[in-house]
Amino acid sequence: EISECLVGSEMCIRDSNYIYWDDGSSIVIQNGNLQYNTKTELEYSYLGYLYGTMPYLTDETTEKFPETEISGIDKEAAIEQVKSILDEIGVEVSKPRVYSLTYEKLEENTDYSQTDPNGNAPHQWTKEDAAYAIVFKGTIDTLPITEVGYRSGPAAGERIVGIVGKQGLIAFHALNIYELETENELSDEILTTQTVLENIQQKFRNIMITDKVEIEKINLEYVPVLKNVEKGEYELKPMFVCMARQNIEHSTDKEDNGLIGDSSIFPIIFDAQTGMEIQIGGTY
């Protein structure tokens, strides 16, 4: 059913987790992940340009690929195409964010002097290569599931994204998708954002820092917490996911240059009921 929803019914090779078509397209379904890639995505790597080295998207992604109209692609139809797949597999999502991977922006973010490990140069973009990236957040009773998370593996958060170009669907990834088995009532009330800000102030009051940290966003989201390693079970807990930015100045070797600036974006996550901080990269 999923394969027909994505590309139709004709296929080349199929087993329990993989489907391959003779045109180079493939679907991988494994451990809460569904990845559909066409040969175009595998060769051009739209998702690589969208995410870069980050596991999630930030405001810098919006600056890099702002939402604009792309000639020859119906944006609303592109959104509906991706949403229909999510409806088919039963994933509840929030309103999408749209990023425009225009020819100009793809060119701007491509370094043609770089080659991949096989020595291949980047794809030479044309106006026909423009595409929309349609990004959703999974939800439970309208509360979003984090994209950020606090560690590697499924607890890194969900990723739901579709790439739609003039030729149709180029890629669709639904990663770290959770199937609810039970729902429990919250044991405590949700803290206020003011309490969260006070916790952040206390955190950095005890750390000697020379560069100011600014909190750009505070979102109440479900964050997966590992419950049973052997069974691969997670508990989705309400957390405040705070996106912080730190502008760092570095001294240069050249006296006439003085200082140069750099920017770092990182999450700070607090349990929304206890106020306890979740250590990034560690355990709960």
Residue ranges and their predicted role:
Residues 2-6, 11-13, 164, 218, ...:
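Generic hydrophobic secondary-structure signal
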Residues 28-48, 146-174, 252-284:
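A short, surface-exposed beta-strand/turn
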Residues 74, 192-193, 271:
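Helix N-cap and loop-to-helix transition residues
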